[in-house]
Amino acid sequence: MVLKIVFPGPLTTVQDFGRLGHQAEGFPECGACDKYSLALANLLAGNGSAPNMAGLEYTLAGPTVQADDYTLVALAGGVSRPKVNGKDAPMFAPILLAPGDTLEIGALESGLRGYLALFGGLDIQPVLGSRSTDLKCHIGGMEGRALRTGDALPVLSAFRLPQEQYALMQKHFTPLESWMLSTLTPHGYIGSAALPLLRIVPGPQDGMFTEQALHEFSHSLYTVTPDSNRMAVKLNGVAVKAKNGVDILSDGIVEGSVQISANGQPIVMLADHQSTGGYAKIGTVISCDIPAMAQVRPGQSVGFRFVTVEEGIAACKREKEKWNQFKEQFYGE
């Protein structure tokens, strides 16, 4: 089976959960910025035991694709109004494409990034253990680049024919609970605008900032700037003041690290983050809140709340438990 790219959209790449274990060699992890939504799309596409199957990540608008054979797909993440052969198709539900069918995902009406998963996953040659596209190193995915019109993506053969898997899933499928439609069950929202409040563990260089700066950071709104990308979300708001500057000897960076730049503005690392950095890190967004950060558009705002390591671990365990409960309900496992 092959999925043909009829129209790629602004930025569509092949992504899985990332190229783990190679930062010491200088390679970014890459992978989906919103791993929750990729996992959800995989679940809905029949890949329940493999939430990290390679699919497509698209930004602001999705691609138009054509199937050459029966193909089971699902969409999650940022919400659009997809169409199959010009007729409305669902988000957050299995979609069976027949030979020659065209799926047009269209512009996102909410969220920043969306995900297309396919039953069996994409049959892309792994590089360093991952099929994810690294746009900086030009490896993984389709020749290490964003997709173009005319690209043909092979789909792995699964353990069951797509049409059989679709029929089986339809017997058990019910509309998703509202919490599943979100990128996460958020800790909270700020005001009537429902701006995400992200939990952040202090450190490792939080001691470089004044107590007043830490308080202001965790009680202020920060707006996403237009120069944000898959590498990092750049924010603008109340400057975070350091005691004696923010430069440090470069040390390791992880997804969710919050650096404070020379002008006092926060930078939140995403999937394509560099392996080291020389700005002080005030904290790290907990892993189950990173998907929410990845879905905030330029011009929208977020807030932060400090939590302990133990609180962060407990929060992510609760999210994992909810996910497992839904998977059991959905697949009867």
Where are the regions that the model predicts?
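Conserved "landmark" site that anchors the functional core of diverse proteins
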Residues: 1-333
